[in-house]
Amino acid sequence: MTEETPGFEEKPDVPSGATPDDAEPKAADSSEEETAAPAGDLDPTVGLTAQLDQARTALGERTADLQRLQAEYQNYRRRVERDRVTVKEIAVANLLSELLPVLDDVGRARDHGELVGGFKSVAESLETTVAKLGLQQFGKEGEPFDPTIHEALMHSYAPDVTETTCVAILQPGYRIGERTIRPARVAVAEPQPGATPAAAKEEKTDDEESGGTEEV
């Protein structure tokens, strides 16, 4: 029969150098780890998707900015080219305007048969040069009067016209492309008030010769 020694109480095993209170924090730490563990189970693609959406939005904004800048640059280039052409046309038009009196003298000399010899060669060379620069002469007898390109210096009535017509070119007009440098100076004729146009007379004569309308 074993006898228990009085005055001694059994205690749980405690590692050497540790006190019984040290076992309680370990239990608490283990409990915290179990609680924090579910946080690591969140889907990592959620954050990546949000970042991808932000990147796509930023890319769309930058692309729109680039397209706007490209459009502005193209408009700038077209505007510069248009202005360059306009300035060139104005400069050429101003130069050729100074030569119009010389061309008028050449035309009068040709009409009077005085364009001969060396003067003829010089005149033809001048006309060729201004033509290469885009100068065009216009204005012909018999064409309808157009106040945008004709300047009427003489006016009369004629029974053989049906509309205001250029019957004489007093001074030819000149243009460069669509730009009129000088209008053609002309003499015009209008239909005679109360007169029957020649075309109507001829039509009436033809009807009379055919015996009029046949009755059935």
UniProtKB/Swiss-Prot annotation:
Q: Name one GO cellular component term.
A: cytoplasm
Sequence segments annotated as region (Disordered): 1-45, 185-216
Question: What InterPro entries is this protein classified in?
Answer: GrpE, GrpE_coiled_coil, GrpE_head
List the GO biological process terms: protein folding
What Gene Ontology molecular function terms does this protein carry?
adenyl-nucleotide exchange factor activity; protein homodimerization activity; protein-folding chaperone binding; unfolded protein binding
Q: Which UniProt keywords apply?
A: Chaperone, Cytoplasm, Stress response
**Top-rank taxon:** Bacteria
UniProt cross-references to Gene3D superfamilies, sorted A to Z = 3.90.20.20, Head domain of nucleotide exchange factor GrpE (2.30.22.10)
Return the Pfam families for the record.
Answer: GrpE (PF01025)
Give the compositionally biased regions (Acidic residues): 205-216
Give the subcellular location.
Answer: Cytoplasm
PROSITE patterns under this entry?
GRPE
Q: Which family does it belong to?
A: Belongs to the GrpE family.
How it assembles, according to the record, is: Homodimer.
Purpose: Participates actively in the response to hyperosmotic and heat shock by preventing the aggregation of stress-denatured proteins, in association with DnaK and GrpE. It is the nucleotide exchange factor for DnaK and may function as a thermosensor. Unfolded proteins bind initially to DnaJ; upon interaction with the DnaJ-bound protein, DnaK hydrolyzes its bound ATP, resulting in the formation of a stable complex. GrpE releases ADP from DnaK; ATP binding to DnaK triggers the release of the substrate protein, thus completing the reaction cycle.
Q: What is this protein called?
A: Protein GrpE
Originating organism: Streptomyces griseus subsp. griseus (strain JCM 4626 / CBS 651.72 / NBRC 13350 / KCC S-0626 / ISP 5235)
